[in-house]
Amino acid sequence: MVESEIIKLLNSKGIKAYMERPKDASDEYVIVEKTGTASKDWVTISTIAIKSHAPSLLKAAQLNEKIKKIMVYTSERGLSSIRLINDYNFTNISTKEYRYQAVFSVVTRQFMEE
């Protein structure tokens, strides 16, 4: 699963990354979510959303910048290409939970994530 590879990558860089919000969530963490996948000729392209959570909007934006640099400049085996599609403020207005979200296109050389 491409999500687990990305979580391992982010954890190795000191970022607390999960697939869902942990019960004992720290102040700063990210959630990795696959929002779509397409495969052809043993190449899989996944759309990955990474939500950066932090106690302030500034800290969420700074965490988002770290995530973008890690993702775009990685040379992780198995992740052939990573391209930033978009990033934006994703604050939950009703709960005042500060978040940023970055969306990436991730290419792997596996057919349907064996």
Residue ranges and their predicted role:
Residues 1-16, 24-27, 33-114:
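Charged, amphipathic alpha-helical segments and their flanking helix caps
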